[in-house]
UniProtKB/Swiss-Prot annotation:
<dbReference type="GO" id="GO:0004222">
    <property type="term" value="F:metalloendopeptidase activity"/>
</dbReference>
<protein>
    <recommendedName>
        <fullName>Protease HtpX homolog</fullName>
        <ecNumber>3.4.24.-</ecNumber>
    </recommendedName>
</protein>
<keyword id="KW-0472">Membrane</keyword>
<keyword id="KW-0997">Cell inner membrane</keyword>
<dbReference type="GO" id="GO:0006508">
    <property type="term" value="P:proteolysis"/>
</dbReference>
<keyword id="KW-0812">Transmembrane</keyword>
<keyword id="KW-1133">Transmembrane helix</keyword>
<feature type="active site">
    <location>
        <position position="156"/>
    </location>
</feature>
<feature type="binding site">
    <location>
        <position position="159"/>
    </location>
    <ligand>
        <name>Zn(2+)</name>
    </ligand>
</feature>
<dbReference type="Pfam" id="PF01435">
    <property type="entry name" value="Peptidase_M48"/>
</dbReference>
<keyword id="KW-1003">Cell membrane</keyword>
<dbReference type="InterPro" id="IPR050083">
    <property type="entry name" value="HtpX_protease"/>
</dbReference>
<feature type="binding site">
    <location>
        <position position="155"/>
    </location>
    <ligand>
        <name>Zn(2+)</name>
    </ligand>
</feature>
<feature type="transmembrane region" description="Helical">
    <location>
        <begin position="46"/>
        <end position="66"/>
    </location>
</feature>
<dbReference type="GO" id="GO:0005886">
    <property type="term" value="C:plasma membrane"/>
</dbReference>
<feature type="binding site">
    <location>
        <position position="228"/>
    </location>
    <ligand>
        <name>Zn(2+)</name>
    </ligand>
</feature>
<keyword id="KW-0482">Metalloprotease</keyword>
Length: 309
């Protein structure tokens, strides 16, 4: 196993999640949220707004806490860690995730699984970097070689060590809270009025809600794309840029139809190494959870040129 043998000899500087920085942003965000509540609604609804905002923040974190159990059922994932690997490529997956976990100083190694799908993809999920799970599709194992598989796994492990699942949930909480702040005054106006004023207030509520949803989707998608670039970069650093580039080129072949896909699933697309449903136009790219493969490959090629200097 040339690829894995090279990885064993590579010195890796493990990144560390800056909890203080995350806590600072959360505190500032909460302060800004309640300030907006006071500006827009005054004292009238402050009594129950905190509870509603807490619910808006709490929902993404509850989803994060149960994410492993949810995806295990949704994807019919077969766990292959602790001697469960039955093929050479499954053993490669286990060995690679184990080795990367050691090099990245994880206190607890991720659970490792394979799911039955022709979709050539992989994803990471879990409430924290020490309670994570990495899963790959059978289609990926059937279609990629050793270095490509290592590149994909390094990308997913980068999500784990960067705490991307947690930061994504924090962002979703802020987006949900923004939706509550933006729409609830209009909904309360509908309840407090009658006739034409009520109809007008309800129409305004739906309009503002849709605008808030679109804005939230744009913000979360922009962060997701930035997160993917970061995972690509770290994956290239802890393995080799050629590994990540090779994996992305293979995915590009798939996206261009040179390799057929079946049974693709939109659910959990934002957690995967690529999103097969991204649109090519400017409007579509605004809502894409992943950058285009061409842009990701170009970013890796720039890294290659830098490292060769």
């Amino acid at each position: 196993m040339k690829g894995l043998a090279e990885l064993k000899n590579k010195i890796v500087k493990a990144p560390h999640l800056n909890i203080f920085k995350i806590g600072t942003w959360v505190t500032m965000g909460l302060f800004a949220t309640f300030l907006l509540v006071y500006i827009f609604v005054g004292d009238e609804m402050l009594n129950y707004y905190p509870l509603l905002i807490l619910f808006a923040f709490g929902t993404p974190f509850i989803s994060l806490m149960i994410s492993k159990a949810t995806v295990k059922r949704a994807y019919n994932i077969r766990m292959i860690g602790d001697g469960g690997a039955s093929t050479e490529k499954e053993k490669l997956v286990v060995d690679t995730v184990t080795l990367l976990s050691q090099k990245l100083d994880l206190q607890k190694f991720p659970e490792i699984g394979v799911y039955p799908s022709n979709d050539i993809n992989a994803f990471a999920t879990g409430a924290s970097k020490n309670s994570a799970m990495v899963a790959v599709s059978q289609g990926l194992l059937n279609s990629m070689n050793e270095t490509e598989i290592i590149g994909v796994l390094a990308h997913e492990m980068s999500h784990v060590v960067n705490g991307d699942m947690l930061t994504s949930s924090i962002l979703e909480g802020f987006v949900s809270a923004f939706g509550v702040i933006a729409t609830l005054p209009f909904l309360m106006g509908e309840n407090n009025n009658r006739g034409r004023r009520a109809a007008s207030s309800m129409a305004t509520y739906y309009m503002v809600r849709n605008v808030a949803n679109i804005f939230g989707k744009i913000v979360s998608s922009a962060y997701s794309r930035r997160r993917e670039y970061g995972a690509d970069k770290l994956a290239a650093e802890i393995t080799d840029p050629s590994y990540m580039k090779s994996a992305l080129l293979r995915l590009q072949e798939i996206s261009e139809g040179r390799i057929s896909l079946q049974n693709s699933d939109r659910e959990f697309a934002s957690f995967k190494i690529t999103n097969n449903f991204s649109m090519g136009n400017i409007f579509g790219n605004l809502f894409a959870s992943h950058p285009s493969l061409a842009k990701r490959i170009a970013a890796i090629e720039r890294m290659e040129k830098t490292t060769k200097k």
